[in-house]
């Protein structure tokens, strides 16, 4: 197969590993800088151009689209889909999962466990919003944030009111969530490929920190997940319509709660922690499921 990898940086660990794994299995791997691809949309034959030449003959595309380029990245990926190129994750599923609020609304509709979450526009509704999520301590999240940036833990209702007012004053869209104390600053990253959780790791926040992101100094370790956690991760990825996803789960007193479904999960942490060839498993999934003109939309909403 001729496989495109949409990535801003060919030197990133995840991009490098996918290229290595694909090459090892006999595929032609081509890394394309997402922002340098441009499109002829209105022609009868949809095209993508790259560095002055049309991109042709691709069987599949692996999107590694960073959060900051979601809009343009999804447009490029959609154009590949219009050309009949099979996407590992489709554009509509990536857009769905990148919208934190929309993704929680869709997960909630399917009865998947979530932390109690509130969303409001008017400062007049702040006290009621805080009560809605069972009061302080609570977590405030900027909807556009990634890697733990724009996430604040407020220990008291007074602090929460001040922080929410400040974000609203800056015209930032935020959501307010209950703080799951019993998780102890840890979450579980379940790596889903197709209809299997192929690997899982526990991410523990460093002392004095509640965000467990590895980018914020968190540590990763092997973990055995429960059947309920496995089923929750698989259902969450399916609701989003994602074939490959990193599903972040908290262990709470009332079962597993989904924090986020990541459409472009990093490979370094999970491969290093588990010793599994995750990149190879992803390429195998493409071989089994991918092919020209197999671009039917998955997921709803």
Curated annotation (Swiss-Prot):
Cofactor binding: number and manner: Binds 2 magnesium or manganese ions per subunit.
SUPFAM superfamilies in the record: Glutathione synthetase ATP-binding domain-like
Signal peptide: none
UniProt cross-references to InterPro entries, sorted A to Z: ATP-grasp, ATP-grasp_RimK-type, ATP_grasp_subdomain_1, RimK, Rimk_N, Rp_bS6_RimK/Lys_biosynth_LsyX
GO CC field: cytoplasm
Binding of Mg(2+) 2, residues: 260, 262
Residues binding Mn(2+) 1: 248, 260
Binding locations of Mn(2+) 2: 260, 262
GO molecular function: ATP binding; metal ion binding; ribosomal S6-glutamic acid ligase activity
Keyword ATP-binding appears in the UniProt entry: yes
Keywords attached to this entry: ATP-binding, Ligase, Magnesium, Manganese, Metal-binding, Nucleotide-binding, Protein biosynthesis
Residues reported in the UniProt entry to bind Mg(2+) 1: 248, 260
Obligatory cofactor(s): Mg(2+); Mn(2+)
GO terms (BP aspect): protein modification process; SOS response; translation
EC number assigned by the record: 6.3.2.-
Residues reported in the UniProt entry to bind ATP: 141, 178-179, 187, 211-213
Domain of life: Bacteria
Pfam family, one: RimK
HAMAP family the record matches: RimK (MF_01552)
Identification of the protein by name: Probable alpha-L-glutamate ligase
Organism: Pseudomonas fluorescens (strain Pf0-1)
């Amino acid at each position: 197969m001729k496989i495109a990898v949409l990535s801003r940086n060919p030197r990133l660990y995840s991009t490098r590993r996918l290229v290595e794994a694909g090459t090892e299995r006999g595929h032609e791997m081509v890394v394309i800088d997402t922002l340098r691809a441009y499109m002829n949309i209105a022609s009868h034959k949809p095209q993508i151009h790259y560095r002055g030449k049309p991109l042709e003959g691709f069987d599949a595309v692996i999107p590694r689209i960073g959060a900051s380029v979601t809009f343009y990245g999804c447009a490029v990926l959609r154009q590949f889909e219009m050309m009949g190129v099979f996407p590992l994750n489709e554009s509509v599923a990536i857009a769905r999962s990148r919208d934190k609020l929309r993704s929680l609304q869709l997960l909630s509709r399917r009865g998947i466990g979530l932390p109690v979450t509130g969303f409001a526009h008017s400062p007049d509704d702040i006290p009621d919003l805080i009560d809605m999520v069972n009061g302080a301590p609570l977590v405030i999240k900027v909807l556009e944030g990634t890697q733990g940036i724009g996430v604040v833990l407020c220990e008291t209702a007074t602090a929460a009111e001040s922080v929410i007012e400040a974000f609203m004053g800056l015209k930032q869209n935020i959501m307010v969530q209950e703080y799951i104390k019993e998780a102890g600053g840890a979450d579980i990253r379940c790596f889903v490929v197709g209809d299997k959780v192929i690997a899982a790791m526990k991410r523990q926040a460093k002392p004095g920190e509640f965000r467990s992101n590895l980018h914020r100094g968190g540590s990763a370790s092997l973990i055995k997940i429960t059947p309920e956690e496995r089923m929750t991760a698989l259902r969450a990825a399916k609701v989003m319509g994602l074939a490959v996803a990193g599903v972040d789960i908290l262990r709470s007193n009332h079962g597993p709660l989904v924090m986020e479904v990541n459409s472009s999960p990093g490979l370094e942490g999970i491969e290093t922690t588990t010793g599994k060839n995750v990149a190879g498993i992803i390429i195998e999934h493409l071989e089994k499921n991918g092919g020209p003109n197999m671009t039917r939309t998955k997921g709803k909403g």
